[in-house]
From Swiss-Prot:
Record protein name field: Lipoyl synthase 2, chloroplastic
Record Pfam families: LIAS_N, Radical_SAM
Necessary cofactors: [4Fe-4S] cluster
Source organism of this protein record: Oryza sativa subsp. indica (Rice)
Catalyzed reaction equations: [[Fe-S] cluster scaffold protein carrying a second [4Fe-4S](2+) cluster] + N(6)-octanoyl-L-lysyl-[protein] + 2 oxidized [2Fe-2S]-[ferredoxin] + 2 S-adenosyl-L-methionine + 4 H(+) = [[Fe-S] cluster scaffold protein] + N(6)-[(R)-dihydrolipoyl]-L-lysyl-[protein] + 4 Fe(3+) + 2 hydrogen sulfide + 2 5'-deoxyadenosine + 2 L-methionine + 2 reduced [2Fe-2S]-[ferredoxin]
Amino acid sequence: MAAYCSRVYHHHPVSPSTMQGSLARPSIHAGSASLTFRARPNSVSIVRCDADSPPEGSAVAGWAPPGPYTGRDPAARKPAWLRQRAAQGEKYARLRESLGELKLNTVCVEAQCPNIGECWNGGGGAGGDGDGIATATIMLLGDTCTRGCRFCAVKTSNKPPPPDALEPLRTAVAVASWGVDYVVLTSVDRDDLPDGGSGHFAQTVKALKELKPGILVECLTSDFRGDLEAVSSLASSGLDVFAHNIETVRSLQRIVRDPRAAYDQSLAVLKHAKNCKDGMVTKSSIMLGLGETDEEVKQTMCDLRAIDVDILTLGQYLQPTERHLRVREYVTPEKFDFWKEYGESLGFLYVASGPLVRSSYRAGELFVQNLVRRKKAELAPTLQ
């Protein structure tokens, strides 16, 4: 979702499992009241959490397990480059009013994205006066997630409300009326649905393409529990960019993401989406500042390029509340510039890298639009 849109930690306890490798971490369980650490030379710390049940109503209250990876790190001070003005501007106000009237959710609001003013105003920062390319990421399937990743502000529940059957058409009508050329669709995780919500996603894409055939559609998806048939269903719906976030490096997956997510599962989803349709553009995103090393970031970028991911975004993790994961490091703008250059050297066709970059950050800017249209044009002769 994004935007980094995963969820407040809340799920049923799972049995601990041991992961192999020098950087492996065991499973983390919700409701931990007891945590133990083991440090090994030349490795990151390992944390094990013994599960208790979360308190009643915790999904709404924003409950997450306490421990050494939550709270505020006194050594980490938010630098000046992360300070943003409150969102304002005519375009921002108009878009927010329109979304409210149509009862459409956006990950921009639900995940507390720091770029909401810039994106909704068309690239002009919080106050407007940009290049006119406004981007809003519509969040389908409700505003309540079935997973509990420990970095996101989206509320969670094991039994969210059923999907709105009219949402695909309502979304398509709304987006078509805005006159935009590029739209991002995302969703909460819906493990309660047989297909993980891929059918609902696909209906929305098809409705958009019917109402506005020339529009470019990016879908920022969940992993659908690794169900590749669900991936195929969405990938063949007519979308132009298939995005799925790997979120963090391999060693931090169990600390950062819900245990139902996995590094290799995310790679498999992206690889399958790429192979589903000729010319498919794929995209992923990495958060920095969670305790990852440079070598781990490089390896993650190489793993994404090995499956031919085209677009990569890198941004600073920001802690939504005291109950979420601590920020371990504020990465400098200069280091983000390095990661952009490194990504381009690996062959990514487009890299957005900066402290406030999120996975849907200015997704529809002209370079990306031209990239997608060029790929479609290159493919056209083979389809005739």
